[in-house]
């Protein structure tokens, strides 16, 4: 059956040539990212368990994780957590298949603890956090849509859409890599906490990076040491960012600090969830790891949704894969925007529409790019099982 794929030229100024660009990334230890990470890891763990027990993935969605912030008393040299943060694991999962019961709660709790151990090095799992599992069972109608597809192309669980684009702009790449660079510096500067937010503003040819980094108090002796450490971090990030662009880069960090009064951003655990910052799945980065107001975005939470028929997950990841390949393989294309829309109950390989919009380089005609862009889109839609496998194996980021 022929798919409804529409390829058209999009006439607009490419983001790289716009005067103002804003890009954000919430880092690994930001409460929203922690919620995303736990949700996705639980989904992946359930997929593994279902496949081992039943030979296929059963219905589940674990995309409703909530983090309620605790209270702490940070202090130079080491403070204390007064009230632990509370993490509520919710969502839906198949608990019984035939006469076999799946230990969903045990899997979810173990997976959440393992993720926290990896994501937040200074978090004491025994005293700094309470994890509660309230994952329920799925609704009968959605489970039926899921189960009827055991040996066929999955049917969409919802009428929804996914959005992707390529390539990343220079500012987008710098914002993303800034958080990665900060994480890599932890071995040398252990005071760097994992709760990082990078806000990038490009105004004409100047890129401003505003960084919030939760510093870990036990590794900082006093206010002078804090100021010195902060200066060292800014210098490292400035050098890294400047190496990626010919534009001028201005880096500032923890701009809410008041050095005169000694009010600075230090934490006990390296995350603001210890003292007032709640978190939830879907409130942070989009599927490509960024928040990009200059680009089309879907508000769907990608993390934690099942990778078999939940189009809120599959189409967002698929759209980015399609856009990336078109941008890399089709000559004359400056930007690619992909939107894929489903209809509930219809095969996910047959979307209601797959829209591919191409911003072409000067002098390039749509006719030279149309066929190849359509062929790439069609092939990826045919190969959705490959996307599912990439999700199973953790090859695609969701936040």
Curated annotation (Swiss-Prot):
**Which cofactor does the UniProt annotation name?**
Mg(2+)
Q: In which pathway does it act?
A: Amino-acid biosynthesis; S-adenosyl-L-methionine biosynthesis; S-adenosyl-L-methionine from L-methionine: step 1/1
What keywords would UniProt list here? ATP-binding, Magnesium, Nucleotide-binding, One-carbon metabolism, Transferase
Decide whether keyword Cytoplasm is in the record.
no
- Superkingdom to which the source organism belongs: Archaea
Q: What is its EC number?
A: 2.5.1.6
Per UniProt, the enzyme's principal EC class comes to transferase
Give GO terms: molecular function aspect only: ATP binding; magnesium ion binding; methionine adenosyltransferase activity
Q: Which GO terms describe its biological process?
A: one-carbon metabolic process; S-adenosylmethionine biosynthetic process
Positions annotated to bind ATP: 136-141
The answer to whether keyword Transcription applies is no
**Could you tell me what reaction this enzyme catalyses?**
L-methionine + ATP + H2O = S-adenosyl-L-methionine + phosphate + diphosphate
Function comment: Catalyzes the formation of S-adenosylmethionine from methionine and ATP.
What's this protein's family per the entry?
Belongs to the AdoMet synthase 2 family.
- Stored HAMAP family: S_AdoMet_synth2
Which PANTHER family does UniProt cross-reference here?
S-ADENOSYLMETHIONINE SYNTHASE
What is this protein identified as?
S-adenosylmethionine synthase
């Amino acid at each position: 059956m022929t798919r409804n794929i529409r390829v058209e030229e999009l006439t607009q100024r490419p983001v790289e040539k716009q005067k103002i660009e804003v890009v954000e990334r919430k880092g690994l230890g930001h409460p929203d990212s922690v919620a995303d990470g736990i949700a996705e890891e639980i989904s992946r763990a359930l997929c593994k368990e279902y496949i081992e027990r039943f030979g296929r993935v059963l219905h589940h969605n674990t995309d409703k994780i909530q983090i309620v912030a605790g209270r702490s008393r940070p202090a130079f040299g080491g403070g204390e957590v007064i009230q632990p943060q509370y993490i509520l694991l919710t969502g839906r999962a198949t608990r019984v298949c035939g006469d076999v019961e799946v230990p969903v709660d045990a899997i979810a709790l173990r997976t959440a603890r393992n993720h926290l151990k990896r994501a937040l090095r200074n978090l004491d799992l025994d005293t700094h956090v309470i994890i509660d599992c309230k994952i329920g069972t799925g609704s009968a109608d959605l489970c039926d849509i899921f189960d009827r597809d055991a040996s066929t192309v999955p049917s969409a669980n919802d009428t929804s859409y996914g959005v992707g684009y390529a390539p990343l702009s220079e500012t987008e790449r710098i914002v993303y890599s800034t958080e990665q660079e900060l994480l890599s510096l932890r071995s040398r500067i252990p005071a760097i906490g994992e709760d990082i937010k990078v806000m990038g503003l490009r105004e004409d040819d100047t890129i401003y990076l505003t960084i919030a980094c939760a510093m870990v108090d036990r590794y900082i002796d006093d206010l002078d040491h804090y100021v010195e450490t902060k200066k060292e971090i800014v210098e490292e990030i400035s050098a890294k960012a400047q190496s990626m662009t010919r534009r001028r880069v201005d880096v500032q960090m923890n701009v809410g600090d008041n050095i005169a009064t000694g009010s600075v951003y230090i934490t006990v655990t390296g995350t603001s969830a210890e003292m007032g910052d709640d978190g939830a799945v879907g409130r942070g980065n989009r599927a490509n790891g960024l928040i990009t107001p200059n680009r089309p975005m879907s508000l769907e939470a990608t993390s934690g949704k099942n990778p078999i028929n939940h189009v809120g997950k599959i189409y967002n990841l698929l759209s980015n894969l399609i856009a990336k390949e078109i941008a890399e393989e089709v000559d004359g294309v400056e930007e690619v925007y992909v939107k894929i829309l489903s209809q509930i109950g219809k095969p996910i390989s047959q979307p209601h529409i797959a829209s591919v919009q191409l911003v072409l380089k000067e002098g390039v005609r749509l006719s030279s790019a149309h066929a190849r862009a359509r062929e790439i889109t069609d092939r990826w839609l045919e190969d959705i099982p490959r996307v599912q496998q990439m999700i199973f194996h953790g090859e695609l980021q969701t936040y």
